[in-house]
Every structure is written in C-alpha cells, then in structure tokens.
C-alpha cells in the first residue's frame, strides 16, 4: 500500500468537491488529456480518463464510491497497462480551516515481466504526491 498526504488551506466541502468532480481534474492536473463521465448519481461514478505518460497516452476506466466530505473509494476495472489491479481511497478530514487529504493506493502488477515492483511503487507514489500538490496549489489559489 502507498500513502501520501497533503494539508490544503480550504474547507472540507471545497476540497472534497474538487476531488469528487472527476471532470474538474482536467483543469487541475496537466497530464489529464480527457475525461468521459459515464455515470454519476452523486454517490456512484463511472468514468474513463486518458492521461499522458512517458510511453504515450493511457486510458483507464474507474468506478468511484463517494461519501460526501469524507471519503472517495476507487476501483479500476480497466487499470493502467502493466497492472492487473489498482484500487484506492482518498479521505478528507477538516481541522480548523485546513483539510487533510490522504491518498492510498493498492496495486498488483500483471506479472514480473513488466518490470521491478519498486520502480512501479516509486512511480505511483510520485504521481500521487504530484497530483495532491496540484490540487493544493489550485485550491489555495482560487479562494
């Protein structure tokens, strides 16, 4: 499991709303090339997202379960190439005028031939840290 955290100087509602609105990600994250929202009833979401990676564009299909202002769980029935499975969760906790966001990821590679596990772990951790930093910068700049 990988865990990354960030403290964002915004109330939990604004922070949660930014993470929950998957179409908004294209405005915040420079590597997101496109998002197609397939289903959203306010609690359950299904989407595809295409991101730019060093090896070219990658498209994933995700399903998210959202608990307003508390938590977003993710499963990717179509994970990134080289992965058999990718799941995760974001949790949101407000303390005063700061919201603490914790991003957790669990993954399984398709097989050992795709490369060393540590390299994938480091890459996913870097993407998580970078994404959290982009959300922090964007949300704190748009008060």
What are these model-predicted stretches?
Residues 1-3, 57-61, 84-88:
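Short, surface-exposed coil-to-beta transition loops
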